[in-house]
Amino acid sequence: MKKIGVLGLQGAISEHLDKLSKIPNVEPFSLKYKEEIDTIDGLIIPGGESTAIGRLLSDFNLTEPLKTRVNAGMPVWGTCAGMIILAKTITNDRRRHLEVMDINVMRNGYGRQLNSFTTEVSLAKVSSDKIPLVFIRAPYVVEVAPNVEVLLRVDENIVACRQDNMLATSFHPELTEDLSFHRYFAEMI
């Protein structure tokens, strides 16, 4: 049984937990305290508000313990705001959070709430079926290091990438009925 934590401080927590509960041999867990970090096999940092999540990571003394676990190889997946939390650099924001993934992210790259959109894509590495994507005030990656694999582009922007044990997506798979990305992440563990 794989115990996958969802950072339970702010954002789309229950939606990720619900998706994980539908995958065999996965035990979903809402992670809130640093003492729980060593009890999980992987972690999802959900979409929400990156500034609030970053502040709460600091307030709950989670930043350094999470950074240590991720750097030691624990699989982690950041969706939307979670992508920003993982990024080493953010083009339009001086704040930094975990700084573990060799990507440069444009915060709110797709614009404001009114610019939110949905689309469907094919991505054989993740699913043989079309995958629905939901973008809400979404960031995108403007630059990756050579050790980062670009998984998906939408409108020529990088919206999904992977670096070893780290996965980052601009969109919200937890807001669709599709389990493809959650299964893909579970297979990384």
From Swiss-Prot:
Q: Which GO terms describe its cellular component?
A: cytosol; glutaminase complex
Q: Under the GO molecular function aspect, what terms does this record hold?
A: glutaminase activity; pyridoxal 5'-phosphate synthase (glutamine hydrolysing) activity
Q: Which Pfam families match?
A: SNO
Q: Which reaction does it catalyse?
A: aldehydo-D-ribose 5-phosphate + D-glyceraldehyde 3-phosphate + L-glutamine = pyridoxal 5'-phosphate + L-glutamate + phosphate + 3 H2O + H(+); L-glutamine + H2O = L-glutamate + NH4(+)
Q: Could you list this entry's UniProt keywords, alphabetically sorted.
A: Glutamine amidotransferase, Hydrolase, Lyase, Pyridoxal phosphate
Is Lyase among this UniProt entry's keywords? yes
Q: What is its EC number?
A: 4.3.3.6, 3.5.1.2
- Source organism's superkingdom? Bacteria
Instruction: Kindly give the Gene3D superfamilies that the UniProt entry links to this protein.
Output: 3.40.50.880
Instruction: Give an example GO biological process.
Output: pyridoxal phosphate biosynthetic process
Q: Is Membrane set as a keyword in this record?
A: no
Q: Where is the active site?
A: C80, H172, E174
From the record, give the cysteines joined by S-S bonds.
Answer: none
Involved pathway(s):
Cofactor biosynthesis; pyridoxal 5'-phosphate biosynthesis
Q: Which residues bind L-glutamine?
A: G48, E49, S50, R107, I136, R137
Describe its assembly. In the presence of PdxS, forms a dodecamer of heterodimers. Only shows activity in the heterodimer.
Family the entry assigns: Belongs to the glutaminase PdxT/SNO family.
Q: Which NCBIfam families match?
A: PLP_synth_Pdx2
The UniProt function text for this chain reads:
Catalyzes the hydrolysis of glutamine to glutamate and ammonia as part of the biosynthesis of pyridoxal 5'-phosphate. The resulting ammonia molecule is channeled to the active site of PdxS.
- What name does UniProt use for this protein? Pyridoxal 5'-phosphate synthase subunit PdxT
Q: Which gene encodes it?
A: pdxT
